[in-house]
Swiss-Prot record:
This is Coproporphyrin III ferrochelatase. Fe(2+) binds at residues 183, 264. Fe-coproporphyrin III binds at residues 13, 30, 46-47, 54, 125. One of its GO terms (molecular function) is metal ion binding. It catalyses: Fe-coproporphyrin III + 2 H(+) = coproporphyrin III + Fe(2+). Keywords: Cytoplasm, Heme biosynthesis, Iron, Lyase, Metal-binding, Porphyrin biosynthesis. One of its GO terms (biological process) is heme biosynthetic process. It is an enzyme of class 4 (lyase). Belongs to the ferrochelatase family.
């Protein structure tokens, strides 16, 4: 029996490929407004601090291709063909959809490399893909909206947290708190009924319960540079407050809203949060990110197949 041919659209935020890309990338994030020279320099300095341009583009490719290969290995009905679509740099989401159309793909499934749904992120990615497909015609896209509660994904983090706690001394474990975080978004999303904060709270609860961790807190990180208020508390402020008010001496950070080693994790956690823990004399731990680890790729494949099953 001939396999059905299907597009696999993997969408992500995107990252500069080289230093010369930083300005146009940042300009795209700012909706066409060029950043002030000091803002641009600040971003360049952050990339320098993590050892140069973020590894995110390579990791995204490994995740997307790994997912496609794994999907083709674990079932025999569909032959998946992968396309990467990025939000803020080429190949843009629209480019990926146009390529699928050009290759004669009439059916596709899409997934965003962000576990929680929000109108700001996942909804906008899916809309861009859908709008382009509608414009081109004869291409139907089934979109995954969120996958934070996929048991295999939760298990990935449970295992990482357990391993991290097992690596600590008894003294560190006794004074430890788990901080589960995601990318902050403008507070106005709450008034609009966005499920994003609730989904993060559910993630934190599932991971903490699964790993048998009693003391855990929810934080937000990497907020944008705009006058609007953003969701808080910020992870750095939260770290200080927890130290001062509850006396924790060991901080374990799980940035569950992200899936790879990139600027928000390597700088905002490993540098900025560590500055705080060093300042207060506390221990800093951050379990490994999923990147393209087989357990994570398998979790994503399960999500995709479940979605296709649901939409039959």
């Amino acid at each position: 029996m001939e396999k059905k041919k299907m597009g696999l659209l993997v969408m992500a935020y995107g990252t500069p490929y080289k230093e010369e890309d930083i300005e146009r990338y940042y300009t795209h994030i700012r909706r066409g407004r060029k950043p002030e020279p000091e803002m641009l320099q600040d971003l360049k300095d952050r990339y320098k601090a993590i050892g140069g341009i973020s590894p995110l583009s390579k990791i995204t490719e490994q995740q997307a291709h790994g997912l496609c290969e794994h999907l083709n290995d674990i079932q025999d009905d569909i032959e998946f063909h992968v396309y990467i679509g990025l939000k803020h740099i080429e190949p843009f989401i629209e480019d990926a959809v146009a390529d699928m159309h050009k290759d004669g793909i009439t059916e596709a499934v899409s997934i965003v490399l962000a576990p929680h749904f929000s109108t700001f992120s996942v909804k906008s990615y899916n809309k861009r893909a859908q709008d382009e497909a509608d414009k081109l015609g004869n291409l139907q896209i089934t979109s995954v909206e969120s996958w934070y509660d996929e048991p295999k994904f939760v298990d990935y983090w449970v295992k990482q947290v357990k391993d991290t706690y097992a690596s600590m001394s008894q003294e560190e474990r006794d004074s430890a708190v788990l901080i589960v975080s995601a990318h902050s978004l403008p507070e106005k999303i709450i008034a609009a009924g966005d499920p994003y904060p609730d989904q993060l709270a559910q993630s934190a609860k599932m991971i903490a319960e699964g790993a048998g961790i009693e003391h855990y807190e929810i934080g937000w990180q990497s907020e944008g540079n705009t006058p609007d208020p953003w969701l808080g508390p910020d992870v750095q402020d939260l770290t200080r407050d927890l130290f001062e008010q509850k006396g924790y001496q060991t901080f374990v950070y799980v940035p569950v809203g992200f899936v790879a080693d990139h600027l928000e994790v390597l700088y905002d956690n490993d540098y900025e949060c560590k500055v705080v823990t060093d300042e207060i004399g506390a221990a800093y731990y951050r379990p490994e990110m999923p990147n393209a680890k087989p357990a994570f790729i398998d979790a994503l494949a399960t999500v995709v197949l479940k979605k296709l099953d649901e939409s039959k």
